[in-house]
């Protein structure tokens, strides 16, 4: 299901799903393929891409290009999350919380692929509602994007990090 390879720029690329879709026209059906991929550097940068083409390799290539263009930074805390977070996209809801060292990535399917390439090593995660891979990936990236480090919170409130952490 999840395909991984290393690129020259040390980006991890994972293929999450390939689908055959069809368009019905007067003369019959026209088939094409869609590919969903995630790309990350394993150190807090992650992006996803969705490509569509008449052939599978072309769809995967388009998805990888889009994923590399749409990368974002995630504030990680030594291989885990900063705090429990929720993410939503259409019918998919995801919940993720930090885990202690040695726990591993406890997450299903598409969410696991996103967390692996982002550089998260210990996390407890659960997907609720729709488990459509596209929606789960978008919800996971939404949640990771909403995560705030203590430094970010302190800067926003105009306080020191020690005051924030208590």
Swiss-Prot record:
Keyword rRNA-binding: yes
Cellular component GO terms held in the UniProt record: small ribosomal subunit
A Gene Ontology molecular function term of the record: structural constituent of ribosome
Domain S5 DRBM: 11-74
Record carries keyword Transmembrane helix: no
One annotated GO biological process: translation
Keywords for this protein: Ribonucleoprotein, Ribosomal protein, RNA-binding, rRNA-binding
InterPro entries referenced in this protein's UniProt entry, alphabetically: Ribosomal_Su5_D2-typ_SF, Ribosomal_uS5, Ribosomal_uS5_bac-type, Ribosomal_uS5_C, Ribosomal_uS5_N, Ribosomal_uS5_N_CS, Ribsml_uS5_D2-typ_fold_subgr
Pfam family membership, one: Ribosomal_S5
HAMAP family in the cross-refs: Ribosomal_uS5_B
Protein function: With S4 and S12 plays an important role in translational accuracy. Located at the back of the 30S subunit body where it stabilizes the conformation of the head with respect to the body.
Subunit structure of this chain's protein: Part of the 30S ribosomal subunit. Contacts proteins S4 and S8.
UniProt comment concerning the protein's domains: The N-terminal domain interacts with the head of the 30S subunit; the C-terminal domain interacts with the body and contacts protein S4. The interaction surface between S4 and S5 is involved in control of translational fidelity.
PANTHER family membership: MITOCHONDRIAL RIBOSOMAL PROTEIN S5 (PTHR48277:SF1)
Family: Belongs to the universal ribosomal protein uS5 family.
Official protein name in the record: Small ribosomal subunit protein uS5
Organism, as annotated: Sodalis glossinidius (strain morsitans)
